[in-house]
Amino acid sequence: MAYDYENFKKDVNALTNINLSLYKERQMKRRIESLMVRKGYNNFEDYFHAMKKDEELLQGFVGYLTINVSEFYRNPTQWEVFENTMIPLLKKQYGSRLNIWSAACSTGDEPYTITMLLAKYFPLDHIKVIATDIDDVVLGIAKEGFYSKRSLDRLPKELLDKHFEKKGNGYQIKDDIKACVDFRKHNLLEDTYPTGIHMIICRNVVIYFTDEAKDEVYRKFNRSLEKNGILFIGSTEQIIHAKELGYEATDSFFYQKV
């Protein structure tokens, strides 16, 4: 029997623990075929066996799957709602110590944005941000904390001036902000979720999952959150069956556990 996409999915799952069956089939298959051809392979079997032997090729594949589009203060109006509405709500609800989870954090732009905004209202030693991603490469970039000017273009100047040092052709985030963020490898579709979380930020990620996988992620987020905790989702997303999954909308892109 010919080696096909079904075989490829099984082998990728065994090798990486990434279950491609939980992603939208047509969309993901098309993306992988495009990458495969660009890398010079004509079929799934040759591509998989090449990845088994070449760690760099494999990491490139994982990075491509996770679709790492990230920048500081992306979608500014959402961050304004976060600062002006959600931070006071969190402070009233939980006091001065917060546990935040930035899920699928990519290169760290998002968890560092969160931390800088929280630092305007909380002591740094009261802020704990868990930041997770499936991709080792982007986690390495996040831990280093060095960014190009382009990725910082939307960040308010006051935050750039206060929390970054200009170095060469980029900017280094300061150690006091870095110390608040705990970067970890984590697969949203497979791994155990952290608990005792006051707010989860997961933006523009689950749009690539099947409806069943998406709902399961939202259920697990709900179990991770403390009572009345907040889920912050992306500009392209909406939780259709929010009440069934244990949420109510509090603002555009913000949902509260009920």
Can you describe what each PLM-predicted range is?
Residues 107-122:
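Conserved SAM-binding loop of SAM-dependent methyltransferases across substrates and taxa
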Residues 82, 200, 225:
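Residue-level signal for inorganic ion chemistry
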Residues 126-201, 205-213, 238-240, 258:
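Extended basic-aromatic, gly/pro-enriched interface segments that bind polyanionic ligands
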Residues 215-227:
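A short glycine-rich, Lys/Arg-flanked "PGG" loop and its adjoining helix->strand segment in the class I
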Residues 2-98, 218, 234:
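Conserved AdoMet
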Residues 95-108, 128-130:
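Conserved class I S-adenosyl-L-methionine
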Residues 228-235:
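Conserved beta-strand signature within the Rossmann-like core of class I S-adenosyl-L-methionine
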Residues 250-254:
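Short hydrophobic/aromatic beta-strand or adjacent loop that forms the aromatic wall/cage
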